[in-house]
Amino acid sequence: MIPLRVRVPASTANVGPGFDSVGIALSLYLEVSVKEEADKWQVIHSFDDSIPKDDKNLIVSTACKVCPSLSPHIIEVTSNIPLTRGLGSSASAIVAGIELANQLGNLYLTTDQKVQIATNFEGHPDNVAASILGGTVIGALDGKNVSVVRIESKELGVISLIPNEELNTDESRSVLPEMFPFHEAVKASAISNVLVAALCQKKWEVVGEMMERDHFHEPYRLELVPLLPSIRKCAKEFGAYGTALSGAGPSIFILTPYEKRKEIADQLARVFAAMKVCELEIDHKGITVNKEEHIGL
């Protein structure tokens, strides 16, 4: 068979008030290399024992749901995306599984179909659409219909502060209210609208202001990520546009002028030495496939 390698970027979601809607692809990657066919699925990886090495692996189980007739293969998975840190590790695995099915099953899926399938698995389009399309995405899931718009943000630099502690998405969602007062929803929605407009018009100072004024989720998650206010204050003093939780946390996501990202990252690393400070870039390619013939790309 033709050697096949699937590469999927990490992602950050929400960007403050764009809850379950806005996502940005990041320069951390999950890679899946497909080896030979086998009697049963085998996943070679160096992660801990909590990550399955058989057909229960999220990549494989997703692929088999998309294409139940898929022949088992041996695959090797590598990733520098931290697990359960709010950087889209599960979304990248889902996207990789869909592309694995697309390639091995000769499905010829369009990009829109991949986004639709991935959103159905994930429940919201922000992370998965960013990983598929690259760049910055704004998406909405209305019933079964997914709408996504992609925009370029090449002028932006990204810094991620990653703590040692894990935070499960279900735990982080459990602190959110089941009901939201109407007046709060109006206020939160207006801020989100301005965030999206500012992203589209490249008004980065406004983007930074809006991403720090979320009402949908961050006020409720502060108890789980108590360092957010102090990181936000320091980042602004060092020249960043804005700071927000990365997805459900616990990682912190900071937007900066592209040319200042290293300087700001170095300053933050000195202040918050207990956290891993990563100077990243926005990934503008999205999912890529290394193969002589690309299918559905």
Swiss-Prot record:
Catalytic activity field: L-homoserine + ATP = O-phospho-L-homoserine + ADP + H(+)
Q: Where in the cell is it found?
A: Cytoplasm
Mind listing the UniProt keywords for this protein, alphabetically?
Answer: Amino-acid biosynthesis, ATP-binding, Cytoplasm, Kinase, Nucleotide-binding, Threonine biosynthesis, Transferase
Q: What biological process terms from GO does the record include?
A: threonine biosynthetic process
Q: Name one GO molecular function term.
A: homoserine kinase activity
**Binding residues annotated for ATP, in chain numbering:** P82, L83, T84, R85, G86, L87, G88, S89, S90, A91, S92
Among InterPro entries, the record links this protein to:
GHMP_kinase_C_dom, GHMP_kinase_C_sf, GHMP_kinase_N_dom, GHMP_knse_ATP-bd_CS, Homoserine_kinase, Ribosomal_Su5_D2-typ_SF, Ribsml_uS5_D2-typ_fold_subgr
Involved pathway(s): Amino-acid biosynthesis; L-threonine biosynthesis; L-threonine from L-aspartate: step 4/5
Entry GO CC: cytoplasm
Tell me where on the tree of life, at the top rank, the source sits: Bacteria
A Pfam family annotated for this UniProt entry: GHMP_kinases_N
Q: What is its main location?
A: cytoplasm
Give the matching Gene3D superfamilies. 3.30.230.10, GHMP kinase, C-terminal domain
**E.C. numbers:** 2.7.1.39
Give the protein family: Belongs to the GHMP kinase family. Homoserine kinase subfamily.
Q: Which HAMAP family match?
A: Homoser_kinase (MF_00384)
NCBIfam families in the record, alphabetically? Answer: thrB
Q: What biological function has been recorded for the protein in this entry? A: Catalyzes the ATP-dependent phosphorylation of L-homoserine to L-homoserine phosphate.
Q: What is this protein called?
A: Homoserine kinase
